[in-house]
Amino acid sequence: MATAKLISQKAKAHAPSLSQATTAEKNSVLQAMAQQLKADADVLLQANQLDIANAKKNGLSDHLIDRLLLTKARIDAMATAIDHLIELPEPIGAVKEEIKRPNGLVIKEMVVPFGVVGMIYEARPNVTVDACTLAVKTGNAVVLRGSASALHSNKAIVHTLKKAFQNSPIHPDVIQLLEDTSKEEAANMMQLKSTIDVLIPRGGANLIQTVLQEATIPVIETGVGNCHVYVASSADPDMAFDIVVNAKTQRPSVCNACETLLVEQSFAKAHLPALVERLSAKGVSLVGNEGACTLDPRIAQANEDDWSTEYLDLRLAIRVVADTNEAIAHINQYGTKHSEAIITESLAERDTFFATVDAACVYHNASTRFTDGFEFGFGAEIGISTQKLHARGPMGLKALTTSKYGIYGEGQVKE
């Protein structure tokens, strides 16, 4: 079985065939990828069923199985996302800034690929497609290390995507999958600074912390999503109910789902029981602080851990707060800097919330479920960054590029 060192060397060796490719050549490969995913759908579903069977046998939770599952509709959605990606402007080669110096030198800041991007991620075979297609569009080779639970799916997907290079000058080895899913080989991959330019972990808190602690390669941190919705006193009740129910139940197993609901006390007294009725009808189990529990007996007492837990399930923590300042303080204490929403008719409250909540994405009168590269018009995403350097929020094409300075002279020398 090939090692991380060997496959990263292959990726780096063939990266120039991609970084020097034309827009038409890259888009042609992407178009072939979309078509091949649809053509190989049955093969992909069969491979995925092996992973699903193993997941059930190994006792994986329902939310992890949902993340692992491929369906015909999900494969079609992947192909559609590639079609949108093709339509996006070419991200490489643009001049971000041009400066002419008094000595006649012209300095241009140009957008270029990283070179080789490494991905370490859990479950979610769709990430394999997103990573490969975004890498092709941005001219980056990619080294993938998925989880053992998705190995059959990932191998089948990579095999399918590599067929798209058949009639292309771009070498198929710009895509590499590490099939050895041992922790030891993952640790080896994190040390390959000479062949991998940037490393992006995508998964649970333990995975991300392990990568941050062990990697010598520069890391773009993607965070877990302990997301909040705060309902202020002036919120429209119908709007608030719709947003909260959507943010929690539309797909509870993903990182942009709401995990804690904060409700201003006067709104809670008037409307919390009706909101609990809506949530309970969707199968959501509820825990809360004393202020919430006294308003509805269906809310069980929360413990301290509930406020910092990413449930990824039909479970919601509810806290009744005195005002917007208390809600903001709670979010900044327990949040993961991912996605936070306020429901209010007060523009002053909105502006305060936006200015003081520390998160990659802040929402006014909308569900947190929109934190997604496709929803933002990025075509796809390689992750959602919760750090502040290089990239923040959904990472699309721009996040997979860096700068190079071209200096144009006519014989100038330094005096």
From Swiss-Prot:
Its main location: cytoplasm. Pathway: Amino-acid biosynthesis; L-proline biosynthesis; L-glutamate 5-semialdehyde from L-glutamate: step 2/2. GO terms for cellular component: cytoplasm. The keyword Cytoplasm applies. One of its GO terms (molecular function) is NADP binding. It comes from the Bacteria. It is found in: Cytoplasm. Keywords: Amino-acid biosynthesis, Cytoplasm, NADP, Oxidoreductase, Proline biosynthesis. The keyword Amino-acid biosynthesis applies. It catalyses: L-glutamate 5-semialdehyde + phosphate + NADP(+) = L-glutamyl 5-phosphate + NADPH + H(+). One of its GO terms (biological process) is L-proline biosynthetic process. It is an enzyme of class 1 (oxidoreductase). InterPro entries: Ald_DH/histidinol_DH, Ald_DH_C, Ald_DH_N, Aldehyde_DH_dom, G-glutamylP_reductase_CS, Glu-5-SA_DH, GPR_dom. Its EC number is 1.2.1.41. Catalyzes the NADPH-dependent reduction of L-glutamate 5-phosphate into L-glutamate 5-semialdehyde and phosphate. The product spontaneously undergoes cyclization to form 1-pyrroline-5-carboxylate. Belongs to the gamma-glutamyl phosphate reductase family. This is Gamma-glutamyl phosphate reductase. It comes from Shouchella clausii (strain KSM-K16).
